[in-house]
Regions:
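Post-cleavage N-terminal segment of exported redox proteins
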Residues: 2-60, 87, 97-162, 188, ...
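N-terminal, post-signal-peptide region of Sec/Tat-exported proteins
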Residues: 49-80
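Conserved short C-terminal alpha-helix that flanks the catalytic cleft of nucleotide-sugar-dependent
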Residues: 67, 167-168
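The canonical Cys-X-X-Cys-His
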Residues: 74-86, 136, 164, 175-186, ...
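Short cysteine/histidine-rich metal-coordination sites, predominantly Zn2+-binding motifs
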Residues: 93-102, 195-204
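Short acidic alpha-helical/loop segments enriched in Asp/Glu that coordinate divalent cations
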Residues: 150-153, 177-180, 192-196
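C-terminal cap of thioredoxin/glutaredoxin-like
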Residues: 166, 173, 181-187, 199-211, ...
Length: 263
């Protein structure tokens, strides 16, 4: 079954012209960058634009409740330290992943939330890709909606950005493709009826209609890696955080959209 699926996907890629490009990919120029929103149909755009119709906003509302709820042995809520998220969290998600000095490596926003739970609330971490973590992340990220992505400038991050870029450019898996072959070289094409976008992470966590739920950027990355029939990574793996870091640096200056809606 896996072999047959691989052949089918390879055939779709050939039909789309995705494997008929030069071996050396070309990075997208700044002036050509486009949010995934611009590739969507009018109904999907309208759903994202209207907060009363955007299903991702339900998750963000749940996140607001979690923000104000006391948790852990310390009996603290996020609001006890950070106050009103609409002020204190403005622009925060636009800077993540960020460097964590005690760990000596970058952490994404979900990991920062769980580190805060452990360090300050003395609470158990939220499991990856479960509703509570996605909802609280969406609520925090929503406070940066409309603000430009502004990656953490810490010099300590630069080696990790380089690792993320190497991952994005490197061909891998049974299909022998890199992220760049689809998202730099072929973003003007379609694959299985869906547009191939430029992979700018402007709206995560997103509400994806295919999933019928909120989902993280790492969920999307893992889906892509599975599609290449390549070795995958656990949620929170350093390799995925490094890739997130590179993608955010690649999207520098683009406006945040969380919670975005995608097909």
């Amino acid at each position: 079954m896996k072999f047959g699926t691989t052949i089918l996907l390879a055939s779709l890629l050939v039909t789309a012209g995705i494997v008929l490009r030069p071996l050396i990919a070309t990075e997208i120029q700044s002036a050509e960058r486009r949010s995934g929103y611009t590739f969507m149909g009018p109904e999907t755009k309208a759903m994202q634009d209207d907060d009363t119709a955007n299903p991702g906003m339900l998750g963000a509302l749940d996140g607001e409740a979690l923000w104000n709820r006391k948790a852990g042995a310390a009996g603290k809520a996020c609001a006890d330290c950070h106050g009103d998220a609409r002020a204190s969290m403005k622009g925060v998600a636009a800077r993540y992943p960020a460097y964590d000095k005690p760990l000596g490596r970058p952490v994404n926003l979900e990991q920062r939330i769980n580190l805060c739970r452990a360090r300050h609330q003395e609470a158990d971490p939220f499991p990856y890709e479960k509703h509570d973590l996605l909802a609280l992340t969406a609520f925090v990220a929503e406070q940066s909606r409309g603000m430009p992505i502004a990656p953490d400038p810490s010099p300590e991050l630069q080696p990790f950005v380089a690792k993320g870029r190497d991952f994005f450019m490197h061909r891998q898996g049974q299909l022998n493709l890199g992220c760049t072959n689809c998202h730099d070289d072929n973003w003007d094409k379609h694959l299985a009826g869906s547009p191939v976008t430029q992979a700018h992470p402007t709206g995560y966590p997103i509400y994806r209609l295919e999933w019928q739920s909120l989902g993280s950027l790492q969920r999307r990355l893992r889906n892509c890696i599975n599609g290449l029939r390549a070795q995958n990574f656990d949620f929170g793996a350093p390799e995925l955080v490094e890739l997130e870091l590179y993608l955010m640096s690649r999207a520098r200056g683009m406006p945040m959209e969380t919670p975005a809606v995608r097909p």
